[in-house]
Amino acid sequence: MGVTLNIIGGLAVSQLAFMAFFFALYHRRHLIGRLLALYAFCLICHVLTYLPATHVNGLAQQVFYRCAALAPAVLWLVSRYLFVDNAKVPRWIWALIVSYMGLRTYGSLTIGNAPGFTTAYALTYVIPQFVMLGFSAHAILMAFQGLSSDLVEP
């Protein structure tokens, strides 16, 4: 099973890397190109967290987990850029992103991988998980709302 997972994960990483390099090289002057390259990088990190070969180095694993946790926020930024006209990201959204990333990092470093359900676990894992779910759900909602105001006729 480990070999199959490594092969499929390697294929996914290679495709996402091509996507990231494409947007980083050919669309780096546009915000959407940089955001999509960052999103592809976050997805690469998410795939790498599941590969058994990457579980050897604890520091690399922490970096992969942090970048993977950033993916819902980056998806929300991409969706906001694409579907909301002339929208600026409010400061409280940036604060929310920094807060949930900080809580996840703190929880990962202090509680570890085998926590019991305590208040600290709820603050550092459960609440950030709901924030990430909220970012993802709102990104999908913005896409559906953007369909009605799209200029392309069906």
What is each PLM-predicted segment?
Residues 1-123, 128-132, 139-153:
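N-terminal low-complexity or simple alpha-helical regulatory segments
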